[in-house]
Amino acid sequence: MKLTIAISLASILLLSVAHVAQGCDCGCPTTSPKPCQTTVPTCAPTTTTTTTTTCAPPTRPPPPPCTDAPTTTKRTTEKSTTRRTTTTTRQTTTRPTTTTTTTTTTRRPTTRSTTTRHTTTTTTTTRRPTTTTTTTRRPTTTTTTTRRPTTTTTTTRRPTTTTTTTRLPTTRSTTTRQTTKSTTSKRPTHETTTTSKRPTQETTTTTRRATQATTTPKPTNKPGCGCKSCGPGGIPCGSCPKRQGLCTELNNLLRQLERRVRECVCGQPVWLL
């Protein structure tokens, strides 16, 4: 904006100086010449065209011929001062200022420096020690529950020997045969929801002994088996089992017999046993 104002002021000063120069007497005839044409400045404010018309010099009459008698001629010189009225017509054309900014970007060629760096890469591979994980499986403990076989106890009672002594000459020995019936009963099992019933096997053992003529033995003070007195504190014979096992076994037999009697003799259902 300041640049435009400065340029316009400079052009005005130039025009005023030019018009002052044109107002002087140029020696033209008295006829008023046509006013000099002044070009209207174009729209460009920076260019001012000034046309200055220079008038031709006045033509002087030829001198008179020379005579013997000098004649004195008085020349009356009239100075006509003609002031020219300079009419400056300024046409101010206001045009929209179109500022065209042309940005020319000149890219310099990019000079790429290729620097080849030789990089020595030393790769150190450290192998970790191989960790061998030994998984030791515990041996599978197989618990084998062995049920004791049903012990069939055959109780053989010795037949009672009745010796009848008669004065008759004939001595008769009466041997009573006794049949011992051994009942095999079930071993008590832990009852669950399902009660299984084992078949009861009956073992009948018939022992026949030969008839012998018996003699009444004399009473002795020693026990028959040669053992010490029986009881909790006594020493069992060698053929007898251990007392703890024998007690358990006899209790089981008693329970089995009771169950058998309730089931088969009394007729109680299984779920009540």
From Swiss-Prot:
The keyword Repeat is assigned to this record: yes
Biased composition (Pro residues): 58-67
Keywords annotated in UniProt: Repeat, Signal
Residue segments, region Disordered: 47-225
Signal peptide feature range: 1-23
Top-level taxon of the source organism: Eukaryota
Ranges of Low complexity composition bias in the record: 47-57, 83-225
Name of the protein this chain belongs to: Salivary glue protein Sgs-3
Species assigned in the record: Drosophila yakuba
